[in-house]
Amino acid sequence: MSEIIQNFIPVKEIRNGYIETFDNRLIKILEIEPINFALCSEDEQIAIIMSFASWLKIAPVNIRFKSVTRRADICEHIKSLRDDIKRERNATVENLGEGYISLIEEVGMKEALTRRFFLIFESSTIIRLTSDISRAYSEMWAVEQAAKNYFLQCGNKIIEPQDEDEFTAEILYMLFNRKMSENKPFLEHVKSRVLDIMGEKNLKYGTDKIPDIPAVEFFAPREMDFSHPDYVTVDGTYYSFLYIRGNGYPACVRAGWTSVLVNAGDGVDIDVILKRENRNKAVDSVSQKIRLNRTKFKNTQDTSGDYEELS
C-alpha cells in the first residue's frame, strides 16, 4: 500500500466496532434504517422532529450524517425467483415468472437504487494516555445508546450487527472501493488480501500462521489519484466534491427538506456535517448582532440579556 493512501486513511485499528486513528481519535459509524417521513401524519412528523431536536441538544461535538446511493443489487432476488420457477409445474405460471424476471432486470439496470444512511461521530476525549482509552470508550458507548433511544423514538432503528468490527470494516470497504465492492463481497476481498500479503512474505496459506495485518489493508483502495484540480480518482471511480456553506442554504425549511438532496440519484453521496460551537461565544456573537440591528433600526441600546430572552 502506497504512502499517500496510508496518509489519506489514518486508521490505526478497529476494535469493538470503534475506529482508532493515528491522531488519537475514536470514531463510530452507525447505520440507520430509514422511514418514509412523507407518509407519516402531521402529528407524527412533529413528534419525530421534536425527538430529533432533543437528541441534537445532547449530541457529540462533531457529527456527520451520510447517505450513500448506489445501484440496487438484484442478483439475490432474481436467484430466489429462479429457484421458485424451477419448482413450479404450471407452464403458465413459469412463463409469467420469466416475464417478471425480465421486467426486474430491465428496471433494475435503469432505475433500481438502494440507499444507506449513516451517523458518524467521534469522541471529544483525545487519547493521549492509557487512562484516556477507557474514558473515551465509556463516552462513546453512552453516546451510542442515547442515539439508539432517540432515533427509535423517531421510528428509526440502528442496525446492530453480530460482528461490529467486520461490519465497520465492510462499510469502509464499500466507501473507499465503490467499483470493486459492487462485484466482490467484503469477505471474499479479505481472503484475497490475506493470500496476497502472505504471498509477499513467502508464507503458505493453510500451513503457515497468518501474520498480523493492519486493518486498513482490508478496505484501502489499490489506487488514489489527487493530481487533477477538479476531481480525484479512487478505485477507478471519479469524484467531484461540491460544498454548500452553512449560510448557503435557507435557514427556514419545510420538514423533510433533505429528501431533495438524498434523491439526487445514483453515485451521489450527501454529507451533513455538524459541529457544536461554544455556547458563550455563540451568545456573544448573536447578542452583538441583535444590538447592532436594533440600534440601527430603533436607535436603542440592548444587552446580551435580550438574546437569553429570545432563546
Regions found by a protein language model. Give the residues of each.
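Extended, folded cores of ATP/NTP-driven motor/assembly subunits in large transport
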Residues: M1-S311
